[in-house]
Protein backbone atom coordinates (compact mmCIF):
# COMPACT_ATOMS: atom_id res chain seq x y z
CA UNK A 1 0.00 0.00 0.00
CA UNK A 2 2.83 2.41 0.81
CA UNK A 3 4.63 2.66 -2.50
CA UNK A 4 8.09 3.41 -1.12
CA UNK A 5 7.77 1.09 1.90
CA UNK A 6 11.16 -0.60 1.41
CA UNK A 7 13.12 2.63 1.15
CA UNK A 8 11.38 4.07 4.22
CA UNK A 9 11.64 0.89 6.34
CA UNK A 10 15.39 1.18 6.82
CA UNK A 11 15.25 0.42 10.56
CA UNK A 12 13.21 -2.07 12.55
CA UNK A 13 11.33 0.73 14.37
CA UNK A 14 10.43 2.45 11.07
CA UNK A 15 9.33 -0.88 9.59
CA UNK A 16 6.99 -1.53 12.54
CA UNK A 17 5.60 2.02 12.33
CA UNK A 18 4.96 1.62 8.60
CA UNK A 19 3.24 -1.75 9.14
CA UNK A 20 0.95 -0.13 11.72
CA UNK A 21 0.21 2.71 9.30
CA UNK A 22 -0.53 0.26 6.48
CA UNK A 23 -2.88 -1.69 8.73
CA UNK A 24 -4.79 1.49 9.60
CA UNK A 25 -4.96 2.58 5.97
CA UNK A 26 -6.13 -0.86 4.90
CA UNK A 27 -8.95 -0.96 7.46
CA UNK A 28 -10.13 2.46 6.24
CA UNK A 29 -10.50 1.23 2.65
CA UNK A 30 -14.21 1.21 1.69
CA UNK A 31 -14.23 -2.47 0.72
CA UNK A 32 -12.95 -3.38 4.18
CA UNK A 33 -15.48 -1.45 6.24
CA UNK A 34 -18.48 -1.69 3.89
CA UNK A 35 -18.43 -5.49 3.96
CA UNK A 36 -19.81 -5.25 7.52
CA UNK A 37 -22.89 -3.43 6.23
CA UNK A 38 -23.44 -4.51 2.63
CA UNK A 39 -23.79 -8.08 1.42
CA UNK A 40 -25.54 -9.72 -1.51
CA UNK A 41 -28.97 -8.04 -1.61
CA UNK A 42 -28.86 -7.00 2.07
CA UNK A 43 -28.01 -3.81 3.94
CA UNK A 44 -27.32 -3.95 7.67
CA UNK A 45 -28.25 -0.80 9.64
CA UNK A 46 -27.58 -1.29 13.32
CA UNK A 47 -29.39 -4.50 14.21
CA UNK A 48 -31.83 -4.15 11.31
CA UNK A 49 -31.27 -6.10 8.13
CA UNK A 50 -32.90 -4.61 5.03
CA UNK A 51 -33.80 -7.10 2.34
CA UNK A 52 -33.33 -5.26 -0.95
CA UNK A 53 -35.52 -7.68 -2.91
CA UNK A 54 -38.46 -5.94 -1.19
CA UNK A 55 -37.81 -2.87 -3.36
CA UNK A 56 -38.53 -2.24 -7.02
CA UNK A 57 -35.35 -0.25 -7.70
CA UNK A 58 -32.11 0.43 -5.82
CA UNK A 59 -30.59 3.89 -6.16
CA UNK A 60 -27.21 5.07 -4.86
CA UNK A 61 -25.88 8.57 -4.23
CA UNK A 62 -22.19 8.56 -3.30
CA UNK A 63 -20.26 11.72 -2.63
CA UNK A 64 -16.94 12.61 -1.08
CA UNK A 65 -13.32 11.72 -1.59
CA UNK A 66 -14.03 7.96 -1.30
CA UNK A 67 -17.32 8.04 -3.23
CA UNK A 68 -16.17 6.18 -6.31
CA UNK A 69 -14.59 3.28 -4.41
CA UNK A 70 -17.64 2.99 -2.12
CA UNK A 71 -20.04 3.00 -5.07
CA UNK A 72 -17.88 0.50 -6.94
CA UNK A 73 -17.89 -1.89 -3.97
CA UNK A 74 -21.64 -1.56 -3.42
CA UNK A 75 -22.43 -2.06 -7.11
CA UNK A 76 -20.58 -5.40 -6.99
CA UNK A 77 -22.70 -6.56 -4.05
CA UNK A 78 -26.17 -5.30 -4.93
CA UNK A 79 -28.07 -4.72 -8.15
CA UNK A 80 -27.98 -0.93 -8.39
CA UNK A 81 -30.56 0.44 -10.83
CA UNK A 82 -29.00 3.87 -11.11
CA UNK A 83 -26.67 6.14 -9.18
CA UNK A 84 -24.80 9.40 -8.91
CA UNK A 85 -21.16 9.66 -7.82
CA UNK A 86 -19.58 13.02 -6.92
CA UNK A 87 -15.79 13.10 -6.53
CA UNK A 88 -13.11 15.81 -6.48
CA UNK A 89 -11.84 17.20 -9.77
CA UNK A 90 -8.79 15.42 -11.11
CA UNK A 91 -9.86 12.14 -9.52
CA UNK A 92 -9.40 9.08 -11.66
CA UNK A 93 -12.78 7.55 -10.92
CA UNK A 94 -12.86 3.76 -10.96
CA UNK A 95 -16.58 3.64 -11.77
CA UNK A 96 -17.08 2.02 -15.16
CA UNK A 97 -20.76 1.13 -14.90
CA UNK A 98 -23.06 3.10 -17.19
CA UNK A 99 -25.63 3.01 -14.38
CA UNK A 100 -23.70 5.78 -12.59
CA UNK A 101 -23.45 9.44 -13.56
CA UNK A 102 -20.18 10.91 -12.27
CA UNK A 103 -19.61 14.57 -11.38
CA UNK A 104 -16.13 16.02 -10.81
CA UNK A 105 -16.52 18.92 -8.38
CA UNK A 106 -14.37 21.45 -6.52
CA UNK A 107 -12.66 20.67 -3.23
CA UNK A 108 -12.06 22.27 -0.76
CA UNK A 109 -13.84 25.16 -2.46
CA UNK A 110 -17.18 24.46 -4.13
CA UNK A 111 -17.47 25.35 -7.81
CA UNK A 112 -20.12 25.44 -10.56
CA UNK A 113 -19.85 21.67 -10.96
CA UNK A 114 -20.57 21.30 -7.21
CA UNK A 115 -23.82 23.20 -7.75
CA UNK A 116 -24.62 21.20 -10.89
CA UNK A 117 -24.06 18.00 -8.91
CA UNK A 118 -26.22 19.33 -6.06
CA UNK A 119 -29.10 20.05 -8.43
CA UNK A 120 -28.73 16.62 -10.06
CA UNK A 121 -28.81 14.85 -6.68
CA UNK A 122 -31.84 16.88 -5.57
CA UNK A 123 -33.70 15.95 -8.77
CA UNK A 124 -32.57 12.31 -8.49
CA UNK A 125 -33.78 12.00 -4.88
CA UNK A 126 -37.11 13.66 -5.72
CA UNK A 127 -37.68 11.06 -8.45
CA UNK A 128 -37.63 8.19 -5.94
CA UNK A 129 -40.86 6.53 -4.86
CA UNK A 130 -41.70 4.52 -1.75
CA UNK A 131 -41.10 1.37 -3.82
CA UNK A 132 -37.46 2.39 -4.24
CA UNK A 133 -34.50 2.05 -1.89
CA UNK A 134 -32.08 4.99 -1.82
CA UNK A 135 -28.63 4.43 -0.33
CA UNK A 136 -26.36 7.37 0.48
CA UNK A 137 -22.61 6.74 0.72
CA UNK A 138 -20.90 9.79 2.23
CA UNK A 139 -17.21 10.43 2.83
CA UNK A 140 -15.05 13.45 3.60
CA UNK A 141 -15.23 16.52 1.41
CA UNK A 142 -18.89 16.13 0.59
CA UNK A 143 -20.04 19.61 1.56
CA UNK A 144 -17.88 21.30 -1.06
CA UNK A 145 -18.33 18.61 -3.71
CA UNK A 146 -22.11 18.72 -3.45
CA UNK A 147 -23.32 22.29 -3.00
CA UNK A 148 -26.69 23.94 -3.29
CA UNK A 149 -26.30 27.41 -1.75
CA UNK A 150 -29.38 28.61 0.12
CA UNK A 151 -30.14 32.34 -0.18
CA UNK A 152 -26.51 33.13 -1.02
CA UNK A 153 -24.49 32.94 -4.22
CA UNK A 154 -21.82 30.38 -4.99
CA UNK A 155 -19.25 33.20 -4.82
CA UNK A 156 -20.41 34.07 -1.29
CA UNK A 157 -20.28 30.43 -0.22
CA UNK A 158 -16.74 30.13 -1.60
CA UNK A 159 -15.75 33.29 0.30
CA UNK A 160 -17.10 31.93 3.60
CA UNK A 161 -15.31 28.62 2.96
CA UNK A 162 -12.03 30.46 2.31
CA UNK A 163 -12.42 32.41 5.57
CA UNK A 164 -13.06 29.19 7.49
CA UNK A 165 -10.01 27.54 5.91
CA UNK A 166 -7.79 30.53 6.72
CA UNK A 167 -9.05 30.73 10.30
CA UNK A 168 -8.05 27.14 11.06
CA UNK A 169 -11.64 26.16 11.89
CA UNK A 170 -12.19 22.55 12.93
CA UNK A 171 -14.34 20.27 10.79
CA UNK A 172 -17.15 20.56 13.36
CA UNK A 173 -17.00 24.36 13.13
CA UNK A 174 -16.96 24.13 9.33
CA UNK A 175 -20.01 21.89 9.32
CA UNK A 176 -21.87 24.10 11.80
CA UNK A 177 -21.55 27.07 9.44
CA UNK A 178 -21.94 25.22 6.14
CA UNK A 179 -25.18 23.46 7.06
CA UNK A 180 -26.82 26.90 7.25
CA UNK A 181 -25.55 27.90 3.80
CA UNK A 182 -26.82 25.00 1.71
CA UNK A 183 -30.14 23.33 0.93
CA UNK A 184 -28.42 19.93 1.03
Region locations from a protein language model:
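N-terminal loops that bind phosphate or other acidic moieties
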Residues: 1-139, 143-184
Amino acid sequence: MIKNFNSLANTEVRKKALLILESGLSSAQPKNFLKSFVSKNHILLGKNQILLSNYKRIFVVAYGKAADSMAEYVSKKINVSQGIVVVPKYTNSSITSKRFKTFYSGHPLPDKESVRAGRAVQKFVNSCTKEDFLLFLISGGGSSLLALPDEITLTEKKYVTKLLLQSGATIDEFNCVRKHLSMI
